[in-house]
């Protein structure tokens, strides 16, 4: 029996930027995805992650698809597990991170 899965991990980000995946050994923007898990480590208290369904750093309010806050100190780990099929992004995923050492998503893309 074989198992076929499209669940993957994004490239780890340590600052604001476009969420990417490795494709044939090179990083490429994720354009369509079902985000199932968001994983991060705080670099200080009051860490935040905002994900936008867009390419580029416009941070359009209407494109905000996720806003998570966590942490009371540095080095705290947070895992946001999203129910069902997760959050769908169909344009791209731009991440705005505050007080995070790193973050990545797990999903289908």
Question: Whereabouts are the PLM-identified features?
Answer:
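Residues on the solvent-exposed faces and adjacent turns
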Residues: 42, 53, 97-99
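Short, surface-exposed beta-strand/strand-loop-strand elements in extracellular ectodomains
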Residues: 44-64, 104-107
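Noncatalytic modules at the cell exterior or secretory-pathway interfaces
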Residues: 36-38, 85-99
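Exposed aromatic-hydrophobic patches
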Residues: 77-85
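Surface-exposed coil/turn segments at beta-strand junctions on protein surfaces, enriched
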Residues: 31, 73, 86-88
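Short proline/glycine- and polar residue-rich coil/turn motifs
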Residues: 69-76
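C-terminal interaction-tip segments
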Residues: 1-31, 96-109
């Amino acid at each position: 029996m074989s198992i076929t899965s499209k669940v993957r991990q994004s490239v780890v980000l340590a600052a604001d930027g476009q969420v990417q995946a490795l494709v044939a050994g090179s990083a490429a923007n994720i354009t369509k995805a079902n985000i199932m898990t968001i994983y991060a480590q705080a670099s200080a208290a009051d860490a935040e992650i905002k994900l936008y369904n867009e390419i580029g750093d416009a941070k359009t309010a209407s494109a905000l698809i996720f806003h998570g806050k966590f942490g009371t100190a540095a080095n705290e780990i947070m895992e946001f597990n999203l129910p069902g099929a997760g959050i769908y992004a169909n344009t791209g995923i731009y991440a705005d991170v505050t007080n995070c050492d790193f973050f990545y998503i797990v999903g289908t893309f």
